[in-house]
């Protein structure tokens, strides 16, 4: 009879009895599995790290001084979140507590020695199907995440374009700092440097950097649309900042804020200190 086609995942067989690993290896290789064997913890972990195709692990519960359940936990730590594998625990003892502990750490199945060959093969096939499904789900999730990232970037680009159009419509298509006084006859006087604004009102220094930035732009006569464009935030966020600034500076409207941060107010504040 022809040997079955090779499987996608390799099997790591761990048992401190070489005869057991040899018999299991022969059984599984005759069923199309590629096998890696180990008789102790250190070599098992090294083999698992060296071969990313290992997706199925058969491990004896007692490995001399080592414990198969603890070894499965170590393999999970090595695998991390980016690698999947399914594990089977073998034991020559009938212990309910060991079964519970094995299931708790993530072992998928539990067999008593001597294991019926066909029962073990059927169990491996079930786990192999489950592993394929987990990998497919992970790939599908990764693809969805990539599409969401692309969609988010596209939406951000559209949002920036809309903001730019709004700014050009409401702001006469020129940055606020470049508008001439002739084109804006009702605009307040030319803005003062940021370092000059702060001393004019002691409450100004208590604002956060973002609140100060919004306050300065309000004092220059910019609309919420224009401030949003300047700072790269939404208009609703601008409204929230303006409300916070007015409350923290004990003012009732934007006009009071603009007057408080005007060059004249700054000069008065300086004159109060220097005589």
From Swiss-Prot:
Domain HTH luxR-type: 200-265
Alphabetized InterPro entries for the sequence: CheY-like_superfamily (IPR011006), Sig_transdc_resp-reg_C-effctor (IPR016032), Sig_transdc_resp-reg_receiver (IPR001789), Tscrpt_reg_LuxR_C (IPR000792), WalR-like (IPR039420), WH-like_DNA-bd_sf (IPR036388)
SUPFAM superfamilies: C-terminal effector domain of the bipartite response regulators (SSF46894), CheY-like (SSF52172)
Keyword Phosphoprotein belongs to the record: yes
Sequence ranges assigned to domain Response regulatory in this UniProt record: 10-128
UniProt entry tagged with the keyword Nucleotide-binding: no
Source organism, top-level taxon: Bacteria
DNA-binding region: 224-243
Alphabetic keyword roster: DNA-binding, Phosphoprotein, Transcription, Transcription regulation, Two-component regulatory system
Annotated phenotype, changing residue 60 to A: No change in transcriptional regulatory activity
SMART domains documented for this protein: HTH_LUXR, REC
Region (Disordered) location: 173-205
Any GO BP annotation: positive regulation of single-species biofilm formation on inanimate substrate
Membrane spanning stretches: none
Modification 4-aspartylphosphate occurs at: 60
Induction profile: By carbon starvation. This increased expression is controlled by RpoS.
Disruption phenotype: Expression of flp in response to carbon starvation stress is completely eliminated in the deletion mutant.
Gene3D superfamilies in alphabetical order: 3.40.50.2300, Winged helix-like DNA-binding domain superfamily/Winged helix DNA-binding domain (1.10.10.10)
PTM characteristics: Phosphorylated by PprA.
GO molecular function, one term: DNA binding
Entry function: Member of the two-component regulatory system PprA/PprB involved in biofilm formation by controlling the expression of many related genes including type IVb pili major subunit flp pilin, adhesin bapA or cupE fimbriae. Functions as a transcription regulator by direct binding to promoter regions. Negatively regulates its own transcription.
Identification of the protein by name: Two-component response regulator PprB
Gene (UniProt): pprB
């Amino acid at each position: 009879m022809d040997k079955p086609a090779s499987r996608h995942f390799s099997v790591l067989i761990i048992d401190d009895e070489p005869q057991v690993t040899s018999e299991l290896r022969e059984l599984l290789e005759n069923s199309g599995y590629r096998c890696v064997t180990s008789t102790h913890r250190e070599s098992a972990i090294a083999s698992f790290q060296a071969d990313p195709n290992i997706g199925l692990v058969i491990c004896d519960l007692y490995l001399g001084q080592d414990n198969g359940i603890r070894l499965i936990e170590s393999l999970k730590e090595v695998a991390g979140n980016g690698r999947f594998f399914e594990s089977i625990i073998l034991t020559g003892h009938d212990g309910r507590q060991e079964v519970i502990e094995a299931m708790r750490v993530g072992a998928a199945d539990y067999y008593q020695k001597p294991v019926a060959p066909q029962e073990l093969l059927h169990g491996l096939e079930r786990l192999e199907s489950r592993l394929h499904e987990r990998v497919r789900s992970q790939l599908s999730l990764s693809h969805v995440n990539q599409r969401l990232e692309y969609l988010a970037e596209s939406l951000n680009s559209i949002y920036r374009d809309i903001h730019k159009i709004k700014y050009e419509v409401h702001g006469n298509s020129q940055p606020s700092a470049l508008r001439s006084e002739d084109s804006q006859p009702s605009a307040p006087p030319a803005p003062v440097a940021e370092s000059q604004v702060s001393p004019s009102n002691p409450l100004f220094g208590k604002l956060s950097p973002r609140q100060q930035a919004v306050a300065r732009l309000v004092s220059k006569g910019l609309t919420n649309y224009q401030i949003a464009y300047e700072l790269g935030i939404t208009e609703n966020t601008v409204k929230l900042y303006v409300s916070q600034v007015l409350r923290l500076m004990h003012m009732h409207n934007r006009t009071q804020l603009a007057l408080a941060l005007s060059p004249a107010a700054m000069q008065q504040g300086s004159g109060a200190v220097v005589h």
